[in-house]
């Protein structure tokens, strides 16, 4: 009987972090492409949909690259370097796209009754480059862009800022050559204190969006007074495609 944890989900996903130059094209991961798309994409286009509007975007696919139309799609949705773009396969060459900011939270867009009408009138050759805080004149030129919601942060005293954390149920893991080589990841002290971890040798389970799990050993190092997990961190990182340069959030 097949392991249910390893079975393909009903709607498969892939994600890509945006690096400098991302607006030229976007690469589909090799494994996803060979399993889901290869052989059905020659001379065709993919359909991209988002929750920002009801518009369906037509983007040309050349090999593993999303090319003609990608720049307009990315610009209209105000994608930026450091964002993580999640593609949910809806069947055939149709994808639902969700954008996450550098904090791994879903990007929210300012609702507008005029957005749908404006975006439908965009030429595929238009490039929209203004920010949410652009001037009125620039806004007239760039009608059709979905502006991000502007988050206002409260000022807090410097002493409080050092210990401030908006969400103690998660932490940002920095993937490095050394922790991959040693198959070990140390947990931040703020996280292990808030989560009530028990000293000793325990097990910790990591789960991805597709419900696949990895069981690692959780230990406490007395010399540094920190928890760490090992015995599967490297395997988890490789399977998830975690990047050495992009911080990854663990909940």
UniProtKB/Swiss-Prot annotation:
It is found in: Nucleus. This is B3 domain-containing protein REM7. PANTHER family: B3 DOMAIN-CONTAINING PROTEIN REM-LIKE 3-RELATED (PTHR31674:SF96). The gene is REM7. The keyword Transcription regulation applies. The keyword Transcription regulation applies. SUPFAM superfamilies: DNA-binding pseudobarrel domain (SSF101936). Keywords: DNA-binding, Nucleus, Repeat, Transcription, Transcription regulation. Pfam families: B3 (PF02362). Residues 11-103, 170-251 bind DNA.
């Amino acid at each position: 009987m097949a392991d249910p944890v390893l079975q393909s989900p009903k709607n498969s996903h892939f994600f890509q972090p945006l690096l400098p130059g991302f607006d030229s094209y976007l690469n589909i991961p090799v494994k996803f492409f060979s399993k889901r798309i290869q052989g059905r994409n020659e001379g065709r286009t993919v359909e991209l949909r988002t929750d920002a509007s009801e518009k369906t975007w037509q983007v040309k696919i050349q090999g593993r690259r999303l090319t003609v139309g990608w720049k307009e799609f990315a610009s209209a949705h105000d994608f930026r370097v450091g964002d993580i773009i999640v593609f949910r396969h809806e069947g055939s060459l149709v994808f639902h796209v969700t954008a996450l900011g550098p904090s791994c939270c879903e990007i929210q867009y300012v609702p507008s009754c005029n957005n749908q009408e404006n975006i439908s009138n965009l030429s595929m050759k238009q490039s929209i480059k203004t920010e949410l805080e652009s001037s009125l004149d620039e806004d007239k030129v760039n009608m059709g862009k979905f502006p991000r919601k502007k988050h206002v942060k409260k000022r807090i005293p410097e002493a409080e800022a050092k210990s401030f954390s908006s969400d103690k149920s998660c932490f940002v893991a920095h993937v490095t050559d050394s922790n991959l080589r040693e198959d070990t990841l140390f947990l931040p002290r703020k996280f292990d204190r808030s989560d009530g971890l028990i000293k000793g040798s325990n097990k910790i389970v990591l789960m991805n969006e597709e419900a696949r799990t990895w069981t690692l050993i959780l230990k406490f190092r007395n010399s540094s007074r920190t928890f760490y997990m090992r015995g599967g961190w490297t395997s988890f990182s490789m399977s998830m495609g975690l990047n050495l340069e992009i911080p990854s959030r663990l909940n």
